[in-house]
Amino acid sequence: MIDPFKRLARKGLFLFDPETAHGMSIAALKSGLVPACQITPDPRLCQTVAGLTFENPLGMAAGYDKNAEVPEALLKLGFGFTEIGTVTPKPQAGNPRPRIFRLVEDEAVINRLGFNNEGHEAAFGRLAALSGRGIVGVNIGANKDSEDRIADYVAGIRRFHSVARYFTANISSPNTPGLRDLQARESLAALLSSVLAARDEVAAASGRKVPVFLKIAPDLTEEGMDDIAAEALAHALDGLIVSNTTLSRDGLKDQRQAKETGGLSGVPLFEKSTAVLARMRKRVGAALPIIGVGGVSSAETALEKIRAGADLVQLYSCMVYEGPGLPGDIVRGLSKLMDREKAAGIGELRDSRLDYWAARKV
């Protein structure tokens, strides 16, 4: 339940259109107006995934800090890691405004931003100036007008390999025409071959091998999931992120806003994304890391992602409704859930409801 102060702050922020409010929140983090979260590190929440050690399993998903303006400020809110981007080689404006819509009754957001960002060079300059403390991933994408989208992903690997703690290849945004076609098996094989070859080449030269994750859509057929799992394993991908936004509008209360085109995120995405997560875990086996995203709004929903097969979880849209105190609340809540479950480590609980979620309707 949102407290009265948060309710008042949200009401004030919601007087502005969503994109203006987003810019205001970035400015507040930059200026230090948002207080840091005081969390006592809990070793039970610590996870080593893809060779990286995460103080806790909660991350900020890509899409909020597109241009790497506030990664350190986000980490101070209690996140165990954060992900900047999606960044493309060249700056691009994205789709025309309005392009973000709040569905307040549903605690959801629809966006059709279209990879608006300042490009590789701007983000690289900011990341290079960071202290180096904390895990900051880089989510890479392709320009809308690119003649060779795979080359754009390779360019991202080459540009950011010295500053990224991990990469995410985002091929699942519904807002760049044709981008999701890269999830088709033949295209995906070509993408992974090129991206991982570039990563290995720069690793050989630098001595620094950066893990690569693939972010996939929730709107996949069973055959599509089979294909992605097979290619991920065949190419020794470092991990998956499940999932991006959905095109589905099932069960929404706000039918007026539901008519807007774009990807839906927030609370209504939880069931679908968690079911796809479990299905992918079944397909890839126990060893491949998976980050679960979609509808995480509490410690309970974060833990449920882990029970469904995730090693780590991310959120974004639910913070729009709950405010910057949400990550701290979730991390503290996870510690309490560890007490309740009498678990020595959160990894013990992974897959404990895998069968349940894998059987759920997608």
From Swiss-Prot:
Substrate binds at residues 66, 111-115, 170, 175, 244-245. The active site is at residue 173. It is an enzyme of class 1 (oxidoreductase). Signal peptide: none annotated. Keywords: Cell membrane, Flavoprotein, FMN, Membrane, Oxidoreductase, Pyrimidine biosynthesis. Its EC number is 1.3.5.2. GO terms for molecular function: dihydroorotate dehydrogenase (quinone) activity. InterPro entries: Aldolase_TIM, DHO_dehydrogenase, Dihydroorotate_DH_2, Dihydroorotate_DH_cat, Dihydroorotate_DH_CS. It holds the Pfam family DHO_dh. FMN binds at residues 62-66, 86, 139, 170, 215, 243, 266, 295, 316-317. CDD domains: DHOD_2_like. Disulfide bonds: none annotated. GO terms for cellular component: cytoplasm; plasma membrane. Monomer. This is Dihydroorotate dehydrogenase (quinone). It comes from Rhizobium leguminosarum bv. trifolii (strain WSM2304). The gene is pyrD.
